[in-house]
Amino acid sequence: ALRRRLSGSPSLPTNDREFRATLEPWLDALPANLSSGHAFHWLPGTQRPWHDAGIDLVAGDSVTVLADGRVFLSRPLDIWVGPSFQLWCRIGEEEPVFRGTRATQTFAARQYGRLWLASYFPGEWADASGRLGTPPQEYAKVSGGLSVLVLRWNLGTDVHSLFRDLAKDTRVPGLVLAEAERIDDPVPTPEHWEYLWTLGAGEIYRPSLTRDGRPAICCHTHGDVGILRREARLPLVPGTRLAWSWRVDE
């Protein structure tokens, strides 16, 4: 079930005009040799996937996506989804869908293709290429939307070093600082495990150790959702019993 404030962001989002006004001066100040193009997009919550980002990528292109906004299931009850879960991407028509773990993300294209964006909830994916498994009319039940900036860096740009340098200037927009922090301090997924693709990547689970030094997985979630999985080569036969326990600290 959708949980209250799924995005985990307690602050109020900017509107689309404020979003652009905050980021445009920063974009104008970037050296011309760094970026090969950018575009702003507004994704209304009522728009079913997919939205054409208008950018054709080639293998090796680095792209940064910054987003803000909320898609509401119920405004009176303050039930909404933020960009960390709501904003999905796809390169080309048939490649696997993916999302970031926060309201900001940077990724490298693995193949040529047009970049597409999607406001996901209340939909569910029918397959990994982003075909919907829910009726289109479900999108009429939500409101709000997402403001998105897509920025493509020139080939050869060291994006990690670039954001590290950008973070030294506290005058840059908050979303830029947030992406610098995410790049500089990523949350690793436990080795041999992966997030279930239908819900997307996350920062919920991380490798850890028990008090006596045994390998463990730490689970910490706030306004997020995700399922971790791995292959278990165990034959399921009559009599096979699976058991597990949960611990929740507040």
Name what the model sees in each region:
Residues 2-212, 216-250:
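Gly-Asp-aromatic-enriched flexible segments
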